[in-house]
Amino acid sequence: MNAPDLTRPPLTIRRISLDTGRENVAVISRRSRALRPEVFRGFSRVELRINSKVLLATLMITDDDAMIGPDEVGLSEPAFRRFNEPVGSAVSVTPARSPASLDAVRAKIQGHTLSAAEITAIVDDLAHFRYSDMEIAAFLISAARFTTTDELLALVGAMASVGTKLTWDTPIVVDKHCIGGIPGNRTTMIVVPIVAAHGLMIPKTSSRAITSPAGTADTMELLARVDLDVEQMKQVVHACGGCLVWGGHVNLSPADDILISVERPLSLDTPEQMVASIMSKKLAAGSTRLLIDFPVGPSAKVTNANEAMRLRKLFEFVGDHFGISVEVVTTDGRQPIGRGIGPVLEARDVMAVLGNEPGAPADLREKSLRLAAHLLEYDPKLRGGTGYARAKELLDSGAALKKMQQIIDAQGPSPCPAELGSYAADVLAAADGVVNGIDCLRINRLARSAGAPVAKGAGIDLFKKIGDRVEKGEPLYRVYASDRSEFDLALAAAQAESGFAINHHTPADVDLVS
């Protein structure tokens, strides 16, 4: 039986300045001349249609005639962009029935294992915005309880197949990924030009910050455009051997971005979901060789060697299945890498390393060289064990800086150059001693409270690291902000709890990359 019409005659589209995240929302007046409450009662979603174009949206009712007139349907910003029809267009609105794939979600909630076909149907509906946030959360929570290896493989394959899938005309396409959680750590922007300068292809797509003070895309955006489409990205890669672009604009594994938007507020980050997220994007990007950086530390995502081992085996298992050679390295995750935390400060550190400046952060330089060495040794013409020497040669000679400038020129000038925030103050040591620990989560939160990454010039500039001796009253770091209220908030929080542990015990040395 067909669903009855919700509107007669059609309503006209009105754009509402309402950011509803990734969810499509349609708003209708309670006094709509076309609205029949007895028809839509029991339906929380509606289908909007113009000819063959269809949009599913969550239905909301308003009593505010100034917001929506009786002959209009209002579309939130995400819904308006996706429907892509002019304001004033006539649109039919009918009740939308739940996607059939929700039956599989209910089965998963009840403890059943899903087939590949069921998972493919769920991912397809997710990617086409047929699920509400509540329905997405139900799927994520049910999958967090248990996910079999067969389900994981099906999920990775389905997520990679929806959206853009890149192919390249070379058998070796290298990539790197860090699972995150460490402030600074902007190694990708150094590794990519080193590897591309050597001659290996490295088409790098990166994310914007979700819970951190800066993502690679946020930082690179200060130097060049990152919102390239697929064809523009390919042109840059063919010209330069590599790129540094925002993955969200290339539409790789779009279902993953939707899942992440719901995972974060729920603090869901299971190993299986992490692997599905990363590997689906790498599969869609056409990568054949993948290096994954696991920072290990007390406030990192991976806190010990046992966790790292289990996660490594999961990545390698999925990589083997899809023909991607995966190498995992564990790195020092006890503290930030580099000095700057926040887009402007991190871009400064990157260019200082590439430019071989005397004051460039030594830890950022060394970690980048060692990660690049692993990738360079995928080149069959390079003898095993010589990757580090080659990476250092490319950095020291200026070849990596030259390649970075070529990539910047090819991607186009930055649309948003920025300066450091105009408000600044130092956070001081509360006692004499040795820096014995730095809480990465705390430092991340402080930098975000200062306004990063939205305010590009906000963040934290570190003066001390683990093992450094300090005196009471000596600066540990400087807080920058572009807004007075954010500055006051961040500074007060930092003075109350700096994130630094200072005592008289000298911490043990930990290898930067192992």
Curated annotation (Swiss-Prot):
Q: What GO terms fall under cellular component here?
A: cytosol
Q: What GO terms describe the biological role, i.e. biological process, of this protein?
A: pyrimidine nucleobase metabolic process; pyrimidine nucleoside metabolic process
List its EC numbers: 2.4.2.4
Pfam entry (one): Glycos_transf_3
Instruction: Identify the keywords attached in UniProt to this record, alphabetized.
Output: Glycosyltransferase, Transferase
Give GO terms: molecular function aspect only. 1,4-alpha-oligoglucan phosphorylase activity; thymidine phosphorylase activity
Q: Does the keyword Transmembrane helix apply?
A: no
Reaction(s) this enzyme catalyzes, per UniProt: thymidine + phosphate = 2-deoxy-alpha-D-ribose 1-phosphate + thymine
Alphabetized PROSITE patterns for the sequence:
THYMID_PHOSPHORYLASE
Could you confirm whether the keyword Glycosyltransferase appears in this record?
yes
Similarity annotation: Belongs to the thymidine/pyrimidine-nucleoside phosphorylase family. Type 2 subfamily.
* Protein's name in the database: Putative thymidine phosphorylase
